[in-house]
Swiss-Prot record:
Gene, per the UniProt record: dapL
Family membership: Belongs to the class-I pyridoxal-phosphate-dependent aminotransferase family. LL-diaminopimelate aminotransferase subfamily.
Name this polypeptide is given: LL-diaminopimelate aminotransferase
Enzyme class at the top of the EC tree: transferase
Catalytic activities: (2S,6S)-2,6-diaminopimelate + 2-oxoglutarate = (S)-2,3,4,5-tetrahydrodipicolinate + L-glutamate + H2O + H(+)
EC number: 2.6.1.83
Any Pfam family: Aminotran_1_2
Organism: Aquifex aeolicus (strain VF5)
Stretches assigned to coiled coil: none
Record pathway: Amino-acid biosynthesis; L-lysine biosynthesis via DAP pathway; LL-2,6-diaminopimelate from (S)-tetrahydrodipicolinate (aminotransferase route): step 1/1
Residues at which substrate binds: 14, 39, 103, 127, 177, 365
Length: 387
């Protein structure tokens, strides 16, 4: 009999894999399931990107091993996009690396800088991979609560001095998944000062920067003067361009941090398929009005679903960011109990807040990644539960 390693034994079932299992179980029972669980856009990748990939498939250069750090042309496109979008200067040779989706980079990054016993500061509730990556690297995850009364921003002053001194990395993610909370440059400035004081690496996950339904564009932490001294930022084409299945992302920022991640990657993978990078170049140069069309869809969905659920009496954290709604569970339920009732009695898959950590208890998350008519159908089914 074979036994899992200790590092695997301490991991809970991966949240989204468990949701998928429950969904498939209901589908096999003949239930018309509405999946509002995983943040996987239902819209197609814009056609110019697909056409670029088709053309790139014919290029024999893309049939060979790719560069470990990514094609220069893709890294240059990333640097140019950061300059246009955030007015941040990046050297494509030393401050940009191509990822096989940002999840891969996030999971691998701690391996470059965390020694056994080092502390990794992980927000809670949060994307589970921050904590998982720390565990795989032999680090000790330390929970930094994100509370609604603080607009789901970490309270840096509450981190004990001895913990801060032992910390190697602090993870942040704004616009935030799962809460949809926005970032502020004021918070980023305070965080950069704090990180410099304690010599802590800031690892920023900015995957949702282009998914906003208001007029205020989310910033990058790299806009803060001096942030590049301590920060690396992970980004992805998945959410912005409906490319979750393409697995293409990037990490940018401090050149030593980028180089460390690169050293891990050269030893564990062989880079991203060249044709996908060629398509990524087209994505990064897509006219802004094309991305705005995608945002318009989420604007409509968020408005309609927020109104429908608030009429039922559900309390929603109002935000102009991400394609999620972060909602308080009705009184008398835990997160798991309520989400369990939704799938069992209404055929709706949602994500329990406690799946993102203990401070997510009392909430659930829905993804606005199905057509409007399905969202309204979901709202009607919830209404019929007579909560």
């Amino acid at each position: 009999m074979f036994e899992f390693s200790d590092r695997l034994k301490v991991l809970p079932p991966y949240l989204f894999a468990e949701l998928d299992r429950k969904k498939q179980e209901k589908i096999e029972q003949g239930v018309d399931v509405i999946d509002l669980g995983v943040g996987d856009p239902d819209m197609p990748t814009p056609k110019p990107i697909v056409e670029a990939a088709k053309k790139a498939l014919e290029n024999p250069e893309n049939h060979k091993y790719p560069s470990y750090v990514g094609k220069y042309e893709f890294r240059k496109a990333v640097a140019d996009w950061y300059k246009r979008r955030f007015d941040v200067d990046l050297d494509p040779n030393t401050e940009v690396i191509t990822l096989i989706g940002s999840k891969e980079g996030i999971a691998h990054f701690p391996l470059a800088f965390v020694n056994p016993g080092d502390i990794v500061l992980c927000p809670d509730p949060a994307y589970p991979v921050y904590r998982i990556g720390a565990i795989f690297a032999g680090g000790t995850p330390y929970t930094v609560p994100l509370k609604e009364e603080n607009n789901f921003l970490p309270d840096l002053d509450s981190i004990p001095e001895d913990v801060a001194k032992k910390a190697k990395i602090i993870w942040i993610n704004y616009p935030n998944n799962p809460t949809s909370a926005p970032p502020t440059l004021e918070f980023y400035k305070k965080l950069v000062d704090w990180a410099k004081e304690y010599n802590v690496i800031i690892a920023s996950d900015n995957a949702y920067s282009e998914i906003y339904t208001g007029q205020e564009k989310p910033p990058s932490i790299l806009q803060v003067p001096g942030a590049k001294d301590v920060a690396i930022e992970f980004h992805s084409l998945s959410k912005t361009y409906n490319m979750t299945g393409w697995r293409i992302g990037m990490a940018v920022g401090n050149k030593e941090l980028v180089a460390g991640l690169g050293k891990v990657k050269t030893n564990v993978d062989s880079g991203q398929f060249g044709a996908v990078q060629d398509a990524g170049i087209v994505a990064l140069n897509l006219p802004e009005e094309e991305v705005e069309k995608i945002r318009d869809v989420y604007r409509e969905r968020k408005k309609i679903m927020t109104e429908a659920l608030e009429k039922i009496g559900l309390e929603i954290y109002r935000s102009d960011y991400t394609f999620y709604l972060w909602i308080k569970v009705p009184e008398g339920y835990t997160s798991a109990e309520f989400v369990g009732r939704l799938i069992d009695e209404a055929g709706i898959v949602c994500t329990p807040g406690n799946g993102f950590g203990e401070y997510g208890e009392g909430y659930f998350r829905i993804s606005l990644t199905v057509p409007t008519e399905r969202l309204l159908e979901a709202a009607e089914r919830i209404k019929n539960l007579k909560l």
